[in-house]
Amino acid sequence: GLLLDNSSSYGVWSSYSGGAAIWHIKDIHSSCYGYNDCVAQSPKLVDLEEANDGDLDNALSNGRTTHLFYSGNSATFDNSSTPNSKLYDNSFSGISATSISAAGDNMTLTISK
């Protein structure tokens, strides 16, 4: 499944200008009992879909604003975007988030399936 949230520049996101965070959530129950068991899961149980590249997955970054979706960075998340909304088995989910607005406390986007 997918989870979308507006990560405005408050709290843990206070050092970023904000944007839409899109999280890929593994649908099936997993038995991970310790931190290392959960971190080593493949595919990940919860994974931030990075709007610009995969450097979080490669441990090259601790996070930055361009990992979030917003107009002026990456404003489309669908089956053919990079990253894409395909399921873990690479089949089409049919889910898309498009026309993502500029980052801010209030953001708009179009979600379709």
Residue ranges and their predicted role:
Residues 1-113:
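Non-catalytic C-terminal accessory/binding modules of secreted extracellular proteins
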